[in-house]
Each structure stands twice: as structure tokens, then as C-alpha cells.
């Protein structure tokens, strides 16, 4: 409710109406973020230091008159880095056994996702029948990506004949010793906010303002997960996801000084939802190396790759969607 501060452009737009002179402001920030992960007796640290422009803005104050009802018309602009997604995570170690002594492996999740398809009436062969570039298994709502990757990399048991016997579909990790697992993840991006304001001063007692907000959102995550076994068998799963888009909102504000002889101020602001239009793009790549039998019954080492690009015309899988945030209301008092 006090107003007269650049930050009010994004909270109560009427606060810019209290300015009686021009103003320019900018601030820089230094961030130091760190992540520590501990697993299986191994500790991993990731640190990142970064300088950045946190916010900048200006106000142009236009005096109308001393005796007129409308005293000032002010214009403002502000840039603010409202959200940062920067984060790096690393961890690795020997995966634990379950309380009953069973091996833990992500291949079980692949098998479970495929098993869910069976519960919905789809035969496991459905993946194989659709796993061609023309049929595009990665653009099929009936097939989970982990199920498709695991099938292509031979990472779960394909022998499934009895629909009532769910135990026959399981990850190949069940037949091997504990795997040594590694996970690396890097996230970047943020939300840049641009606010454009016009505000009015009436009789130095009533202040009204409107702010139009524009948002630029970008987020990128790349990760790799791997399991290595003492037998020499392994698999590496790489994934990449990017979300970007724009949004807008409106903010309406009022500040009232009810008593001419008192500095008491009452502030009220309403923020509409922020309306985002976003695009998600993603791709995955899996490489596996396992032992299997050839047509002659001999044991061979098979190296297999599964790339979503091969099924999507060398493109990312993309999905457009809209997001709307809630309404916001702000009531404040200042003295």
C-alpha cells in the first residue's frame, strides 16, 4: 500500500502512481547453488556459481497539474527473473536388495509398464508389431515409452503366454547380480517476466494502476541413467526434455488515502490468471549390451540401440498445451 517502489509494478500497479519524478533501477545477483547426494556410501557434490541480471526497470512520471483532479500519469516498465530452474544432480552406487533379497532394477519398471498394457487387453506382441518407423511406437498412446525402450533393448522377459500369470513378465535384472547404477541430471532455464504499467494519481489521495505482464518460459533437462552388471551386461538410458513458451496476465490495483491529514493507505490489487501456451519436446536413446542365444543355440553378446528419432522422422516428440494459473488477490495497509 505504500507504493513509490519499482517492485509494486508486479504486486499493486497503483504503487507506480505515487512517483513524482523519473526513476531508473537495476540489480545484479550472484547465486551459488549446491547439491549433495549420498547413496550406497558414496557422496557426490555439484556446485554452480552464476552472476545474472535479476531485475531492471524505469518509471516516466508526467505531471498534469497542481490543482487538477488528475495530478500525474506515470508509465513504468520492469524486467524480472522470476524463476530459475538451474540445477545439477549426480549420484551412483550399488543398488540395494529388497528386504526379501531381490535385486532392484529399473528394468522391473519397464516390465511393469508393459504388464499394465496386458491388463488393458494388449498383447506384448503389440509393441513389436508397432515398433516400426511407419507405425511409430513412440507416438502411440497405448504404449509407454519405458515399455517400448525395454522391449527394443531386450531388457525384460518377452515370454508371456498366460494373461493371468503376471510373474512371467519381469526385468532381466532379476536374473543377474546387483547392478552398479549411475544417474546424472542437468536442468537449465527460467521464467523471465516483463511488466508494462500505466498509473494515475487523483488529488494525491486515489491512485489507480494497470500492469500488463508478459512471460517467457524455457526449461531444459538432460539426464542419463545406467546399470552395469558384473557379467559385463549393461544399459544406458539418455533422455532430453525441453519446455518453452510464453504467457500473459493483467494486474489491476488501487491505493486510497481515506483521510487527507493521515498517511494511512489502503491497497487492493487483483491479478488475473497467467495464460501460458507451451510446447514440450522430448527424445530418448537407449543402448543395451546383453548375452543371448543365437539361432544355433550359442551364447553371443548383443549390443542394441533404440532411438526415438528413428520413429519420429529424425525429430523430437512434441506436444502443445496450455496452462493457466489461479487468480490472485492482494489487500494491504500502509502507514
Annotate the PLM regions.
Residues 3-11, 17-95, 189-192:
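Outer-membrane beta-barrel translocator/receptor signature
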Residues 11-12, 252:
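A generic local structural motif
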Residues 61-335:
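Outer-membrane beta-barrel porins/channels
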Amino acid at each position: 500500500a505504500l507504493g513509490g517502489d519499482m517492485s509494486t509494478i508486479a504486486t499493486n500497479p497503483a504503487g507506480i502512481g505515487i512517483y513524482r519524478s523519473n526513476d531508473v533501477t537495476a540489480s545484479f545477483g550472484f547465486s551459488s547453488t549446491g547439491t549433495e547426494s549420498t547413496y550406497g556410501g558414496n557422496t557426490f557434490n555439484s556446485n554452480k556459481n552464476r552472476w545474472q541480471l535479476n531485475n531492471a526497470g524505469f518509471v516516466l512520471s508526467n505531471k498534469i497539474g497542481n490543482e487538477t483532479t488528475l495530478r500525474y500519469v506515470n508509465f513504468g516498465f520492469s524486467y524480472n527473473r522470476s524463476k530459475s530452474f538451474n540445477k545439477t544432480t549426480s549420484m551412483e552406487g550399488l543398488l540395494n536388495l529388497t528386504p526379501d533379497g531381490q535385486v532392484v532394477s529399473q528394468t522391473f519398471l519397464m516390465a511393469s509398464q508393459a504388464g499394465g498394457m496386458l491388463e488393458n487387453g494388449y498383447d506384448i506382441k503389440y509393441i513389436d508389431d508397432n515398433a516400426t518407423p511407419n507405425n511409430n511406437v513412440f507416438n502411440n498412446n497405448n504404449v509407454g515409452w519405458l515399455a517400448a525402450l525395454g522391449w527394443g533393448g531386450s531388457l525384460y522377459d518377452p515370454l508371456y503366454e498366460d494373461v493371468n500369470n503376471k510373474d512371467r513378465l519381469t526385468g532381466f535384472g532379476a536374473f543377474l547380480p546387483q547392478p552398479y547404477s549411475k544417474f546424472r541430471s542437468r536442468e537449465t532455464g527460467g521464467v523471465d517476466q516483463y511488466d508494462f504499467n500505466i498509473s494515475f494519481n487523483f488529488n494525491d489521495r486515489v491512485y489507480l494502476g494497470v500492469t500488463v505482464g508478459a512471460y517467457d518460459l524455457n526449461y531444459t533437462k538432460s539426464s542419463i541413467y545406467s546399470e552395469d552388471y558384473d557379467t559385463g551386461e549393461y544399459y544406458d538410458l539418455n533422455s532430453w526434455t525441453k519446455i518453452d513458451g510464453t504467457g500473459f496476465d493483467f494486474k489491476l490495483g488501487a491505493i486510497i488515502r481515506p483521510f487527507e491529514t493521515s498517511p494511512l493507505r489502503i491497497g487492493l490489487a487483483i491479478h488475473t490468471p497467467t495464460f501460458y501456451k507451451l510446447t514440450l519436446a522430448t527424445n530418448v536413446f537407449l543402448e543395451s549390451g546383453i548375452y543371448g542365444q543365437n539361432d544355433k543355440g550359442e551364447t553371443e553378446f548383443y549390443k542394441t540401440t533404440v532411438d526415438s528419432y528413428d520413429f519420429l522422422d529424425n525429430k523430437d516428440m512434441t506436444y502443445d498445451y496450455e496452462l493457466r494459473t489461479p487468480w490472485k488477490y492482494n489487500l494491504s495497509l500502509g502507514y
